[in-house]
Amino acid sequence: MTLRVGHVITSGVFSLDGEDFDVDNNIWLVGDDREVVVIDAAHDHRPIVEAVAGRRVLGVLCTHGHNDHINAAAELAEAVEAPIWLHPDDGMLWDVVYPDRRVDDSLRDGASIAVGGEDLTILHTPGHSPGGCCIHVPSLGLVFSGDTLFNGGPGATGRSFSSHDVLVGSIRSRLFVLPDETVVHTGHGDSTTIGREARNLDGLTDGVDRDPGSPDAAS
């Protein structure tokens, strides 16, 4: 069966460094008629369960550990009986939200997760957070970028555990090597393409740490 992509948007609050920001989050589902993975369970697990539509959930994949990308993960995992995956370098962020609940497995750079007969490849892209990851689906010509890359430039790096230089390096070395036509499904806002963002070099080298509460950046 051919893989297809599902999309849910939920709204809530991103909290870090003593500040709160209202945000809308993209939740992505990749699978076929029988099985699926969920990318970034944010804010409310109920619409995600509806989008799963009874399929077997192979995993709840967290692109990074900021609260607005994981705060529905535990409830979703319990509801659909699925494991939660997160890169270990974001464990300290996870522990803020879930001090008494561990993740079930680790996202590792270069690892593959099979769903619907196709492989999803994990790309470790630190910078927005130490354990930030993107998820590449070569067969569909797309990548799920979490908060690493947005329509218009890189993710915010003005918060704890983030680095603009590291983020730009990750984008250049891990994402801009993908084909230009690769579709980028982001953690917030509209999708884009690798080619479009690669041409926007000024946005990657201006050294400005964008605030996640601003219209052109997200948590």
Where are the regions that the model predicts?
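Conserved beta-strand hairpin/beta-sheet module of binuclear metal-dependent hydrolase folds
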Residues: T2-R55, C134-G146
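Active-site-proximal loop/helix segment associated with metal-binding centers of metalloenzymes
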Residues: H7-L29, D95-Y98, R102, G153, ...
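Active-site HxH/HxHxD metal-binding segment of metal-dependent hydrolases
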Residues: D22-V23, V36, H43-D119, R199-G207
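Residue-level detector of beta-strand structural context in well-folded domains
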Residues: N26-W28, D105, G110-A111, C133, ...
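Divalent metal-coordination and catalytic microenvironments
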Residues: V30, D40, H64, L76, ...
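Metallo-beta-lactamase
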Residues: V36, D119, P130-S219
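Active-site neighborhood of phospho(di)ester-bond hydrolases with catalytic His/Asp-centered motifs
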Residues: I39, L58-H66, I84-P88, H124-G127, ...
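Short, glycine/acidic-enriched loop or turn micro-motifs at the edges of active sites
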Residues: H43, N67, D90, G127, ...
